[in-house]
Amino acid sequence: MILSHSMGTIIAYDVLRILGEEYPRLLVDHFITLGSPLGLPHVKYKIAQENRLVRTPSIVKRWSNFADKRDPVAFDVHLSGDYTPNSDGVKVMDDLIANDWGGIHHKSYGYLRAPEVSRVIREFI
């Protein structure tokens, strides 16, 4: 499992894409993005420029994107409409949640304490 938040989701996405090219037999069971800016138009444009395709990294077996619609960084909470499935048909699954930690809807610990995120982590462990 790779769990990432905010700018870390862009870094993790890029690393997973590169690893898929260099080590195609490597598999990541679950990629989790929290409060991700991967839906920002400029970010998608840069990914498309570098890779030609805006898609799920080839080595990812499952991708869950958790976002709060009030999170200003997770501008586009529905990544599934932007990222096409990888060659194994794996696509990003969006889950809108309430990140209500102290009224700051982007905090990582607000995402981590959300029941939906905790459940996915618990199932993996």
Write out the residue ranges for each language-model feature.
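Lipid deacylating catalytic domains
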Residues: 1-3, 7-125
